[in-house]
């Protein structure tokens, strides 16, 4: 509890365990919607998410916080394990990473304008 996490028992081992698998489904769908042009304003999407789910952060900003290279690596590990093309991270995400847009770490990701020294979550504009 000291780290702010709540333990969740998973009865059998599964890649990603339980909470991370649900988060993965959210990430995967958000990335799909964004990469295929269904969501073009990630800030608007995040605001809708936060309102709907009573959350203090949306999935796109959370991916920026985690780091887009980390997100890509995690998604790619699922793809490597399954071989299913639906698990492959979108090329558009790789293009962002190759351009040096890694999220909060570099000040540019889905959002821009992060204070990379302070790590302030409230900063960052689409």
How should each PLM-predicted stretch be described?
Residues 1-20, 24-126:
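NAD(P)-dependent Rossmann-like dehydrogenase/reductase catalytic/cofactor-binding core
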């Amino acid at each position: 509890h000291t780290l702010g996490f709540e333990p969740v028992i998973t009865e059998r081992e599964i890649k990603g365990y339980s909470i991370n698998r649900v988060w993965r489904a959210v990430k995967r769908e958000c990335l799909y919607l964004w990469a295929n042009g269904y969501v073009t304003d990630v800030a608007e999407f995040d605001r809708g998410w936060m309102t709907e789910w009573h959350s203090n952060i949306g999935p796109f900003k959370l991916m920026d916080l985690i780091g887009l290279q980390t997100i890509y690596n995690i998604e790619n590990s699922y793809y490597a394990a399954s071989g299913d093309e639906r698990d492959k991270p979108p090329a558009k995400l790789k293009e962002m990473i190759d351009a040096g847009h890694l999220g909060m770490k570099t000040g540019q990701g889905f959002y821009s304008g992060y204070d990379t020294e302070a790590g302030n979550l409230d900063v960052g504009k689409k």
